[in-house]
Structures are given as structure tokens and as C-alpha cells.
Amino acid sequence: YASYHHNIIAHCESRVPRLGPRYTTLALDKGELVDIRNNVYYNYAGEGCYGGEAQKVNLVNNYYKPGPATKLFTGSKEKRQYRIAKPDVYPKDYSGADYKKWLQTWGRFYVSGNCVEGYSDVTADNWQDGVFGQMDAKNCEGGESSALWKEHTSIKVNSPVSGAGHVTTHSAVDAYDMVLQYAGACNYRDKLDELIISDVRKGVATCTGSAKEWESLKGWSDNKPGYINKPSDIGTNAGQLDEKGFPVLATDTEICTEDTDSDGIPDYW
């Protein structure tokens, strides 16, 4: 069982998130159970959220906010702007021998309460365009005429595949506000954290790196808005970051760092 909640993923090319099964957990009595709720996804591109081959997944009350990179999708790919998830199957010729038992097998998905900013119809009905409309028969043996593809709507279940444990569930809109206010790996936010949160709130991409040095490679394309190659692509952000793109941290020179017993912890601690 895996739980992923109240996190933010911003300026990420793809795998937002990638629902990637593991054969050892697929083999458990109840299968691989994944609960994803109350997260915020901003300025995603590539494939966005996809996968879930043979998994059992809850996608509940997440907030999707297309950004400048997301909005570059046009034509047949425009639907990725309002993608909630693209469930799929492992192809018959998948190279992972340990996954043989689960090839050509749909997962089961409980999808409810997700909000896609700017797409009220998808917010109202997550399934029609946000999930079913994103799927294709590419990995189905026999394509669209196969029995496997004809049963692709069977991925939908009407009750959660698992409970949420001790997670408090909020509406997607409330989760958006809470995640932007509280999410993070520390109890305070540095200038880089603040920059990312500001981008999400404003719907912008402040920093974009250049991929020109790789333009001789096959399939090359320059970075989409908001995507960087290295920390220094962020710049100094008006002097709030150093030249390498990292926060400028204060140094306390008054603390004695003597460690008389050599246990790696200063005596004062």
C-alpha cells in the first residue's frame, strides 16, 4: 500500500505522477494499492499522469493547474491540457520478465473529486475526457479491434480500492490552498521554495533553461517554459539566490563547533 498526499509537483516535464507498478507488490494478495489524493500539479507536460498497469489506484481530490508548458499542447495533443490520468497496460512484448503475469492487464481506478483549472466540464466529470478520453489502444495486442481494448472502460470502479488511512481528505480547491501554504520538506521555506510557490499562484514560469548545447542530437527540442537543466538556470532571482541558483543561507559564527568525543555532534548540541 502506498499513499501520496498533500504534495506539489511543479515544472515537471512528465510523470506527474507516473503510476509505476512493481512486480513484487503486484503479487501481494490484494495486489498493489495506491492512494493519491489532495496533491497539486502545475505546469506539467510530456505524458502528465499515466501508467497504473495492473494496479489498483485511488485518484481523489487532486488539483491540476495547466501552466505555460502545458498550454503548448495543440492539435491531437491538446487533450493533455486537461488530462487527469492515462491508464494503460503493459505491451505483450514488455521486456521485464518478472512482469509476465501482468502483461495485457488493466488496472482498477477510483477517480473522484479532481479539479482541472480552466476545464469545468472535466472537473464536473473526471472520467469522460479526463481519463477515458486520454486512453488509447497502442499497447493492446490487436489494437482497437481487440477484446482487451473493448473492455478498457472496466478500469472504472465506483468505490475506493483502499481506505485513506489517517489522511484527512480535503476538497481539491481547499487542498490547493493548503498545499501552497504548508507543503514542503521543512517547517520554513527558503527563497527557492517561495519562487516555486509564487509561480504556481501566478500561473507563470519564471525560469527556463536552454537546451541548445544538445541540439545536434536526434529528436532535440528546446526546453518548454519553466523547465531547467541545472540549478544555475534559475539565476540569482534578484539577488535572493547565489550564482549557482541555490538559496543564500546565513552562517552563525558564534556557535562553537567543538566535538570533543568525535561523535559527529557538536558539544553544544
Which stretches of residues belong to each language-model region?
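Secretory-pathway low-complexity, repetitive Gly/Ala/Ser/Pro-rich segments with frequent Tyr
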Residues: 20, 39, 49-50, 85-88, ...
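Right-handed parallel beta-helix
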Residues: 1-19, 24-26, 30-45, 56-68, ...
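Alpha-solenoid ARM/HEAT helical repeat scaffolds used for protein-protein interactions
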Residues: 46-47, 267
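Structural detector of coil-to-beta-strand junctions
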Residues: 15-16, 47-49, 71, 81-83
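Long, contiguous C-terminal flanking segments immediately downstream of a protein's structured core
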Residues: 60, 64-262, 266-269
